[in-house]
């Protein structure tokens, strides 16, 4: 009975892990940085409402994960006839929050991610050297499935790459809400290498997935 129980438990665990892999968000198309979009019309200016804008994140290990948020520091868009023609926003990397832990465990992980722990500054985001990240729009387009695709240069930890992600945009003349579908980026493309099995070959099962899942919500009001 014990053997059978162990066998079925193992099968169940593999099944759950398989479902988890299948549910993983799609990786953003990533390429070299591109020319930033410039509005060619007299569009309307919108300013990002930082109190209602955020980036949600998830990080994964083989048997667990953590999640939290990062705040938007400032940003603006230029909109013409309901279309965002150009824009950017700045991400406050000092605002990294872990939402699935409490007390010392929460504080310890937040400090490690931000790089405020002596000797571990460069493990993740090193906010003392790189206190902000930026996203600058380069293009809006339509995918083969009809979804709106947003492309932009993500400058993170001093490394700039262009990413393309599916988004939903709602505009009513006074307010614009831009919300991405969940997507992942390969953190090593921005030199966030700590615990990466693709960078270090001696980690065994003690590694952190390269993929970080993100979901962006930007709320902007007419300036």
What are these regions, as identified by a protein language model?
Residues 1-19:
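Sec-dependent bacterial lipoprotein signal peptides
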Residues 21-223:
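Low-complexity, acidic/polar, glycine-enriched regions of mature
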């Amino acid at each position: 009975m014990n053997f059978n129980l162990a066998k079925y438990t193992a099968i169940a665990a593999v099944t759950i892990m398989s479902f988890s892999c299948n549910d993983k968000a799609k990786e953003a198309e990533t390429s070299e940085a591109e020319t930033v979009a410039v509005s060619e019309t007299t569009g309307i200016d919108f300013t990002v409402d930082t109190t209602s804008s955020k980036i949600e994140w998830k990080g994964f290990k083989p048997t667990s994960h953590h999640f939290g948020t990062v705040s938007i520091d400032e940003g603006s868009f230029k909109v013409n006839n309901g279309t965002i023609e150009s824009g950017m926003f700045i991400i406050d990397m000092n605002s990294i929050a872990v939402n699935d832990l409490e007390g010392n465990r929460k504080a310890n992980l937040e400090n490690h991610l931000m790089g405020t722990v002596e000797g571990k500054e460069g493990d993740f985001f090193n906010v003392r050297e790189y206190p902000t990240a930026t996203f600058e729009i380069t293009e809006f387009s339509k995918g083969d499935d009809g979804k709106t695709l947003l492309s932009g240069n993500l400058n993170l930890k001093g490394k700039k790459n262009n990413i393309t992600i599916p988004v939903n945009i709602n505009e009513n003349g006074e307010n614009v809400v831009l919300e991405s579908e969940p997507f992942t980026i390969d953190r090593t493309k921005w030199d966030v290498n700590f615990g990466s099995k693709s960078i270090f070959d001696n980690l065994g099962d003690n590694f952190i997935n390269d993929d970080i899942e993100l979901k962006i919500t930007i709320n902007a009001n007419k300036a």
